[in-house]
Amino acid sequence: MQIFLDSTDTKVIADLASTGLVDGVTTNPTLIAKSGRPMLEVIAEICDLVPGPISAEVAATTHEAMVAEGRKLAAIAPNVVVKIPLTRDGLIACAAFAGEGISTNVTLCFSPTQALLAAKAGATYVSPFIGRLDDYGFDGMDLIRDIRAIYDNYGYETEILAASVRNVTHVKDAAIVGADVVTIPPATFSDLFKHPLTDKGLEQFLKDWAGTGQSIL
């Protein structure tokens, strides 16, 4: 499973990307607004930091305007993925981008039938929002399971990008049910490394090693 960072903080992205474990980055208008920086500048910088797919979202609501904005975003760098909402106009734009060879991430997916339409429109990625479904009393992982089954039934190549991921358990569950990608906040990425028994075991190993008086170097 690929791991993307959901962030526009270029310093944090650079730091976490240095692990070699970051496969891509997703952004959205809210994160861009929080950055306080020009969108095109932020996306260009992220594209330089991470060679993998970088999702940049359109702000338009009509398919004509989405296509115009998407073309401008795609021109920033070869690894830009144009992010579009799962609306009727969004899917019309998605099909247009597919015809032009522009990668897309269809976002705000909350049902299997929406995901089916995204695949039929030629989406590169579809982003089911797991945490938001959980907030309303649904099981977001059921959505990923259903999408996985539909895509496997018909051989769709659209990748399932689990979004609105809140914690390590979400990451684990998304991997189990077959998500191709998970996008997570930097804090959750850092939490993936942690387990109290790892810390406890390392502490004991180092204590025992120190008692030997040896040095490897």
From Swiss-Prot:
Cell location: Cytoplasm
Gene Ontology molecular function terms on file: aldehyde-lyase activity; transaldolase activity
Positions of the catalytic residues: 83
Keyword line: Cytoplasm, Pentose shunt, Schiff base, Transferase
Superkingdom of the source species: Bacteria
Function in brief: Transaldolase is important for the balance of metabolites in the pentose-phosphate pathway.
Keyword Cytoplasm: yes
This enzyme's EC code(s): 2.2.1.2
Keyword Disulfide bond attributed: no
Protein name from the UniProt record: Probable transaldolase
Family: Belongs to the transaldolase family. Type 3B subfamily.
Catalysed reactions, as listed in the record: D-sedoheptulose 7-phosphate + D-glyceraldehyde 3-phosphate = D-erythrose 4-phosphate + beta-D-fructose 6-phosphate
Pathway named in the protein's UniProt entry: Carbohydrate degradation; pentose phosphate pathway; D-glyceraldehyde 3-phosphate and beta-D-fructose 6-phosphate from D-ribose 5-phosphate and D-xylulose 5-phosphate (non-oxidative stage): step 2/3
Main location: cytoplasm
GO-annotated cellular components: cytoplasm
One GO BP annotation of this record: carbohydrate metabolic process
Signal peptide stretch: none
